[in-house]
Amino acid sequence: MDTLRSISSELVRSSQLRWTLFSVIANMSLTLSIWIGVYNMEVNSELSKTYFLDPSFEQTTGNLLLDGFINGVGTILVLGCVSFIMLAFVLFDFRRIVKAWLTLSCLLILFGVSAQTLHDMFSQVFDQDDNNQYYMTIVLIVVPTVVYGFGGIYAFFSNSSLILHQIFVVTNCSLISVFYLRVFPSKTTWFVLWIVLFWDLFAVLAPMGPLKKVQEKASDYSKCVLNLIMFSANEKRLTAGSNQEETNEGEESTIRRTVKQTIEYYTKREAQDDEFYQKIRQRRAAINPDSVPTEHSPLVEAEPSPIELKEKNSTEELSDDESDTSETSSGSSNLSSSDSSTTVSTSDISTAEECDQKEWDDLVSNSLPNNDKRPATAADALNDGEVLRLGFGDFVFYSLLIGQAAASGCPFAVISAALGILFGLVVTLTVFSTEESTTPALPLPVICGTFCYFSSMFFWEQLYG
């Protein structure tokens, strides 16, 4: 009961979780619309018999389940080979090849798969033997494909709005799901789903798993690469205009964390500065005993402050190995001139409430180390525990399960499978997900969805024959 209460409270509290569930529902609904409305849940036998075994084809073992198992294993072997090839490119720093691969895959879906779907839809509406209707079909295919393709380019390859990127993620994953439903023979889909379940566990959790190793090299790539492979439910962008209070709380939390990090950094820096100044005093005393600083010396601070921003000067470049008198004298004079310069002190500030926003912005922008100002990488984005992310493959296989459930012709089974997927996803993201590690989002939803589907089918057949 405590677990259920925790799940329900997290579902109520997190707008990211609710938006992710809504996106999954939209993805499954769009897949069903195309799968049923355009293709009438029929497999493309011409394409399917080229690559798979089935009793209705010439190439078959004669056993439906054995054919499905062989097809499923073969599909995962191909997936594994592609994954390890990509892993090799990543490990050996073939960054251009990796980016080109991801880019071409995205463009193929935006222009190729979408155009094929539009062709299959409009060819059923218009008579292809009539020239006028044939030309109308071409126009209705080309124009939407160009608009959709270039819209997707803007969404995936530029700094577009997050909602636009999410829309194209949902539609692209639906197109891929329908393509798989059209290619896989009837029972092959179930074997593919269950075998890919174990593959996902290996790829994400095993030390030599492809996704595990790729994450270790994520710091070599810009965070923009994630736009091509992951769905992000960014709460700050998501709630724009709809939940301003929650957004402001998130911004305030970010400011407080930044302030805390800044205080810790300059507290450590002050200790290093004290040690440095002590060395300077010793040098002065060794060269000229009369130059030993007194209590009025600028080197002695009347009141120590936990945070103090000092301008860097050339004396910081002095080392213990420097013994030249002229260099020491130069360092002393530079230090004295530096001490007379303007110093920004924030010793009395410890929380965000004690100063205005502009003062903290200046503090953070001017005082953080250079390493904190580097461009954000994919590793930084993946390690951000405040953003909920799902891989494109998760959306694809959720919809693949729903499409296969719809092929049974039982609406009750489809709804049950969808509820099972959503329940498994909620449990995965609330109970098993942690900020320290990546949690596979495919196994539990597939298990719950499959269980709910077959259970509902069993009860449906018992009740209605």
Curated annotation (Swiss-Prot):
PANTHER family, alphabetized: PRESENILIN (PTHR10202), PRESENILIN SPE-4 (PTHR10202:SF25)
Instruction: Tell me the intramembrane segments.
Output: 440-460
Result for mutant: residue 440 to L = In HC78; induces an aberrant localization of tubulin in spermatids
Q: Which residues lie on this side of the membrane: Cytoplasmic?
A: 1-18, 93-96, 158-160, 212-389, 433-439, 461-465
| Gene3D superfamilies named in the record | Presenilin
Intracellular or extracellular location(s)? Endoplasmic reticulum membrane; Golgi apparatus, cis-Golgi network membrane
Q: Residue ranges, Lumenal compartment?
A: 40-71, 118-136, 182-190, 411
| Motif PAL: chain residues | 440-442
How does the entry describe its membrane topology?
Answer: Multi-pass membrane protein
The residues responsible for catalysis, as annotated, are 200, 394
The UniProt keywords, alphabetically, are: Differentiation, Endoplasmic reticulum, Golgi apparatus, Membrane, Notch signaling pathway, Spermatogenesis, Transmembrane, Transmembrane helix
**Keyword Transmembrane attached:** yes
Q: Which organism is it from?
A: Caenorhabditis elegans
Function of the protein: Potential catalytic subunit of the gamma-secretase complex during spermatogenesis, an endoprotease complex that catalyzes the intramembrane cleavage of integral membrane proteins such as Notch receptors (lin-12 or glp-1). Involved in spermatid formation during meiosis II. May be required for proper localization of macromolecules that are subject to asymmetric partitioning during spermatogenesis.
Output the SMART domains linked to this UniProt entry.
Answer: PSN (SM00730)
The annotated regions of Low complexity compositional bias extend over: 326-350
Gene Ontology terms for molecular function? aspartic endopeptidase activity, intramembrane cleaving; endopeptidase activity
From the record, give the transmembrane residue ranges: 19-39, 72-92, 97-117, 137-157, 161-181, 191-211, 390-410, 412-432
Q: Give the record's GO biological process terms.
A: amyloid-beta formation; calcium ion homeostasis; membrane organization; membrane protein ectodomain proteolysis; Notch signaling pathway; organelle organization; protein localization; protein processing
Describe its assembly: Homodimer. Potential component of the gamma-secretase complex, a complex probably composed of the presenilin homodimer (sel-12, hop-1 or spe-4), nicastrin (aph-2), aph-1 and pen-2.
One GO CC term, this protein: intracellular membrane-bounded organelle
Effect in UniProt of substituting residue 165 to Y: In hc196; failed spermatocyte division in a zipt-7.1 mutant (ok971) background
Q: What is known of its domains?
A: The PAL motif is required for normal active site conformation.
Q: Please give the name of this protein.
A: Presenilin spe-4
